[in-house]
A protein has these predicted regions:
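C-terminal glycine/acidic-rich active-site capping loop/insertion
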Residues: 12, 216, 243-244, 249-351, ...
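Hydrophobic residues in well-ordered beta-strands that form the structural core
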Residues: 65, 104, 129-131, 254
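Glycine-centered short loops/turns at secondary-structure junctions
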Residues: 99, 126, 347, 374-375
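A contiguous active-site-proximal alpha/beta segment in oxidoreductase catalytic domains
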Residues: 86, 109-172
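Rossmann-like dinucleotide-binding domain that binds NAD(P)(H)
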Residues: 155-249, 253-262, 269-271, 355
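Short active-site oxyanion
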Residues: 39-43, 77-79, 157-158
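Beta-loop-alpha module in the N-terminal Rossmann-like domain of NAD(P)-dependent dehydrogenases
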Residues: 61-122
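N-terminal Rossmann-like dinucleotide-binding module
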Residues: 1-59
Length: 418
């Protein structure tokens, strides 16, 4: 079984980094030097001058403190937007309207109306818009995708995930695994009081919310996605929680301390015509799923050697010499940046395009709508007005005192975090 080989453009895509907060400087800036075949960073932009100057110094590029001036000078072909979610829509539409390709961090935007305008504006101006989604590019998901294609477990028709990451990220994971969009969602939510505490300077807690989402896909695939406290406060199970990909003849299991492939061999498979007896249906072959790390701390591959076959995903993005804190995370970022570049250059169809980005948001809005209506099944894609989206729109309007669809008004807002 082979993985896709790397594809290189004739010339790198000139990009501007918009947003130079902790994530941009901590996760993106250090890896750009490994991506010079795909992208050339030519400018950074942020109204917070201290952050912007630091990023500009790290990358040895020009610092801009005003997006209007950046777009006027236009040293770039495309932009990578690493700013708070409420700013994504206005920045994306503004860039697209000036012929600049753009990729925004997750979550892509807040409302379906915003997402649709981002897509329409890009189409009208013949530019590419993408979301910088990396969760389905992580080690275990890449292995699960290879396992799916191998048919080793037969058809995988159920995924159970507890306390990993409900919401936009996980929605995208399920789309990528299913290679299609879901048909419906049902959701329930539950809240309970807890002791009060700060989990970060901007996050104060006095209760805990639990969400359980059920997504139905084609080919009888059901995803059960639930979580309440993914950071592990109050002694709860923390991320990555417990996830199972359940197939006809076994299970791929993933949790913090282990990943393994559990297989029910032919010895434990029986037909109704066999003599009845005990012991059938048990997974009698259990194989470790190994994440192999190089001497420099780089993720090399994820594989499982069974009795009769090797199932493996080879990581093509070797950031040689860069010892990252979260092993494999930077490789996933490199993956979506190169995917964006190749899409702009017309060299590859994106693995996760703008319609997928829209559906991930629809899954979230649909889940919220279902929970508001006592678990009613919501058909996807979402059409028409929803109470959930109206609540989101009003909350944004109240928070920023402007219409969230007003591009210039939203561009004028600064979103620094403590």
């Amino acid at each position: 079984m082979t993985n896709n080989e790397l594809v290189y453009p004739t010339d790198p895509l000139k990009i501007a980094l918009i947003g130079t907060g902790g994530r941009a400087r901590g996760q993106y800036c250090p890896i750009f030097k490994f991506l010079q075949a795909w992208v050339e960073v030519v400018a950074v932009c942020d109204p917070v001058r201290k952050n912007c100057d630091q990023a500009a110094e790290m990358l040895n590029v020009t610092a801009y403190y005003d997006i209007h001036q950046l777009v006027k000078d236009k040293p770039m072909e495309a932009a990578l937007v690493v700013t708070p979610v409420p700013s994504h829509h206005s920045i994306s539409v503004y860039l697209s309207s000036h012929g600049i390709h753009n990729m925004c961090e997750t979550t892509w935007c807040n409302t379906l109306g915003q997402a649709r305008q981002m897509i329409e504006t890009a189409k009208d101006n013949k530019v590419i818009v993408r979301v910088a989604e990396n969760f389905f590019r992580f080690s275990i998901d890449r292995f699960a995708q290879i396992l799916r294609d191998s048919d080793y477990l037969g058809s995988i028709q159920r995924i159970f995930s507890y306390n990993d990451h409900t919401g936009y990220h996980n929605n995208s994971r399920w789309i990528a695994f299913a290679q299609s969009h879901p048909l419906w969602v049902q959701s329930i939510e539950h809240s309970m009081p807890t002791i009060s505490f700060y989990s970060s300077p901007q996050r104060f807690h006095r209760n805990e919310n639990f969400r359980a989402r059920y997504f139905g896909f084609n080919q009888n695939l059901l995803v059960v996605d639930s979580a309440s406290n993914i950071k592990g406060f109050l002694g709860r199970q923390s991320r990555p929680g417990h996830t199972e990909w359940q197939g006809e003849s076994g299970t791929l299991l993933y949790r913090p301390e282990t990943a393994e492939l559990r297989y029910c061999s032919e010895n434990n498979q029986q037909s109704q015509y066999d003599l009845p007896g005990k012991g059938g249906g048990r997974a009698d072959r259990v194989y470790p799923v190994v994440k192999e790390i190089g001497e420099d701390g780089q993720w090399l591959r994820t594989y499982c050697q069974t009795d009769d076959t090797l199932i493996e995903y080879l990581n093509p993005y070797r950031l040689d010499g860069y010892r990252e804190k979260s092993i494999g995370y930077s490789c996933a970022i490199a993956d979506h940046i190169s995917d964006f570049c190749l899409s702009v250059r017309g060299l590859r169809q994106s693995e996760f395009d703008e319609q997928d980005a829209l559906m991930s948001l629809m899954m979230e809005i649909g889940a919220q709508e279902s929970a508001l209506n006592q678990g009613e099944r919501i058909q996807l894609p979402v059409v028409g007005e929803t109470e959930a989206e109206a609540k989101t729109y009003q909350a944004l309007k109240q928070q920023y005192c402007v219409d969230p669809m007003d591009i210039e008004a939203m561009l004028d807002i600064s979103y620094p975090k403590p």
